[in-house]
């Protein structure tokens, strides 16, 4: 899973990336300090995995991960190649979802490319560039569909749908906002439009905003309103604070967060939100050799989940021995869970649940 962090120059994008990955991306007070996309892999926070590690004392501990890509900033005209526009559009096409960092903090020492802080304007600037790029891509697909229609009338519905999407884009709306049936969703996915990607607006705020209550910030309220229109999620975060606490030990970090009235870091909330945004869940495997979280889509059946470990597991699937995490914790050991009949034997049609602890039986 790959997530692209985007935003106008000097909104705190690279500061947030540094805090997430400790990759040390150069973060400077001028545009385009992130010329090449920096990539970092970060663990998905999961306290269940920690509990299993305490129980099994494994030789290896492997959490689920998300890949973040810090993508170079863009400016007005990016869809026409202005600034680093061509590079930006190329890099953003490769990600599964977008984290759009929006500046909601005031600071005279940090220049804004437009000269003032206005999150609605900033969001609309990037949205416009993505929409313009999408129109160009969609027009090519529409031309192709029109040619196919001349030979086969079955393409009429496809053409009508794409024209409806284009109409939405021309009105400044995202492809994501277009109402679709299941077949139309597949059609839309086949075009790979930028504005169809899932998105989270990371509202980058000051410590003072958090202390005063983020919901009281007019800038945050503006982001919330626009996110609702965009069918997007929104998460308040203080990138500077996250960067400062990223190097602290867990106890110091918790103390710092408590002072801000928070129970978990903004980064943990962001990572969890991204995981949820993409419709992902984790199942767990546990034993002395390794405790591990495996990432799958919601709705995945047991054989396909087994295939995440190895293709042989899916090909030769016999059954899955499954226990719910809470049941295992209540029993204290896997043996006790089996004695109480809490370890279930599930077949090929079983739909995996988040937090399932599984042992797959297979034969090839």
What are these regions (language model features)?
Residues 23-31, 38-40, 48-51, 80, ...:
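Glycine-rich, flexible loop/turn motifs
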Residues 14, 31, 67, 105, ...:
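Generic signal for short, ordered secondary-structure residues
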Residues 22, 54, 90, 94, ...:
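Short, intrinsically disordered, mixed-charge
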Residues 32, 46-49, 62-68, 82-96, ...:
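Amphipathic alpha-helical transducer elements in NTP-driven molecular machines
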């Amino acid at each position: 899973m790959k997530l692209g962090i985007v935003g106008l120059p000097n909104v705190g994008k690279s500061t947030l990336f540094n805090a997430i990955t400790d990759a040390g991306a150069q973060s400077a007070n001028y545009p385009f300090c992130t010329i090449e996309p920096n990539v970092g892999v970060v663990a998905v926070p999961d306290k269940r995995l920690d509990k299993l590690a305490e129980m099994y004392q494994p030789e290896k501990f492997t959490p689920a991960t998300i890949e973040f890509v810090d993508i170079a900033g863009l400016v007005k005209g990016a869809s026409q190649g202005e600034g680093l526009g061509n590079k930006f559009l190329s890099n953003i096409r490769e990600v599964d979802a977008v984290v759009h960092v929006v500046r909601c903090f005031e600071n005279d020492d940090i220049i804004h490319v437009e000269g003032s802080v206005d999150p609605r304007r900033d969001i609309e600037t990037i949205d416009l560039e993505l929409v313009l790029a999408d129109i160009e891509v969609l027009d090519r697909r529409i031309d192709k569909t029109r040619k196919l229609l001349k030979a086969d009338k079955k393409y009429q519905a496809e053409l009508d749908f794409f024209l409806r999407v284009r109409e939405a884009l021309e009105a400044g709306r995202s492809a994501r906002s277009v109402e679709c049936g299941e077949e139309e969703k597949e059609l839309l996915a086949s075009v790979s439009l930028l504005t169809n990607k899932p998105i989270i607006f990371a509202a980058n705020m000051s410590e003072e905003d958090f202390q005063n209550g983020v919901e009281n910030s007019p800038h945050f309220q503006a982001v919330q309103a626009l996110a609702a229109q965009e069918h997007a999620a929104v998460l308040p975060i203080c990138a500077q604070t996250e960067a400062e606490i990223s190097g602290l030990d867990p106890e110091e970090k918790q103390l710092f967060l408590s002072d801000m009235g928070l129970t978990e870091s903004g980064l943990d909330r962001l990572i969890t939100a991204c995981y949820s945004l993409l419709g992902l869940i984790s199942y767990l495997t546990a034993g002395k050799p390794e405790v591990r979280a495996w990432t799958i889509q919601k709705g995945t059946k047991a054989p396909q989940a087994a295939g995440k470990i190895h293709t042989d597991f899916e090909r030769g699937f016999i059954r899955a021995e499954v226990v719910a995490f809470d049941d295992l914790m209540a029993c204290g050991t896997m043996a006790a869970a089996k004695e109480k009949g809490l370890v279930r034997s599930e077949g090929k049609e079983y739909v995996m649940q988040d937090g399932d602890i599984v042992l797959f039986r297979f034969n090839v």
